[in-house]
Amino acid sequence: MENRKNYFHLHLVSDSTGETLIAAGRAAAAQFQSSHALEHVYPLIRNKKQLMQVLDAIDGAPGIVLYTIVDRELAGMIDQRCREIGVPCVSVLDPIIELFQSYLGSPSRRRSGAQHVMDADYFARIEALNFTMDHDDGQMPADFNEADVVLIGVSRTSKTPTSIYLANRGIKTANIPIVPGVPLPDGLLRATKPLVVGLIASADRLSQVRQHRVLGTTQSFHGEEYTDRAAISEELKYARTLCARNNWPLIDVTRRSIEETAAAIVALRPRLR
């Protein structure tokens, strides 16, 4: 089928926060680089009045409709209206729920936002986020042994965003910059509980990212060495040596997304799952 246009409307209708839909929609849209998705997100849609406004908006800008609505009547309204105006729609969770029901031999609860219940896991995530923010960029090294994971790496290896992503999964994460000539904190070297992981990237990639950082800030950096490929190569050599000396695993983040890096870290220690 030929490409219709260089953009399309993507309607994401949810009875909860919409996070599941946004992730699924973006993952699918990313496979079609020739067309740009114009996202329309409708969270917390739980009654007919709210849904009618959404359906009118879809009618005004037809496109692909993805939804996670557990109320069967509301879901039926979406299906019917989409058929009437001739747009495709998919209930993202239904095939998964049906698979679970078939395998487990029991019906689902059909409860909106069930994944966001304020249970023990929720409070564990909040605790992990607080810990991670308090221990960003080498802060509070004395209690690194309370961490589940400690990330170390030279500048611009995505330590902070990866730490936050892990914290959102309930994993307490600290991160420390590796700077040649600057010793790591004693608190890290004494810690026995956390998984310590080194993050590296190619010198070319780091030079490019650092150049963008320098251009986008008034912050002072250490001269041309910060972006110089040869100097960066020496930083990376030091980081590799440091990790090898302490038997810490290394992950190259050059071609990895934050999510892929986090998955690789979790795979190193199954109990983090």
Curated annotation (Swiss-Prot):
The keyword RNA-binding does not apply. Its EC number is 2.7.11.32, 2.7.4.27. It is an enzyme of class 2 (transferase). It catalyses: N(tele)-phospho-L-histidyl/L-threonyl-[pyruvate, phosphate dikinase] + ADP = N(tele)-phospho-L-histidyl/O-phospho-L-threonyl-[pyruvate, phosphate dikinase] + AMP + H(+); N(tele)-phospho-L-histidyl/O-phospho-L-threonyl-[pyruvate, phosphate dikinase] + phosphate + H(+) = N(tele)-phospho-L-histidyl/L-threonyl-[pyruvate, phosphate dikinase] + diphosphate. The keyword Nucleotide-binding applies. One of its GO terms (molecular function) is phosphotransferase activity, phosphate group as acceptor. It comes from the Bacteria. Pfam families: Kinase-PPPase (PF03618). Keywords: Kinase, Nucleotide-binding, Serine/threonine-protein kinase, Transferase. ADP binds at residues 153-160. Belongs to the pyruvate, phosphate/water dikinase regulatory protein family. PDRP subfamily. Bifunctional serine/threonine kinase and phosphorylase involved in the regulation of the pyruvate, phosphate dikinase (PPDK) by catalyzing its phosphorylation/dephosphorylation. This is Putative pyruvate, phosphate dikinase regulatory protein. It comes from Sinorhizobium fredii (strain NBRC 101917 / NGR234).
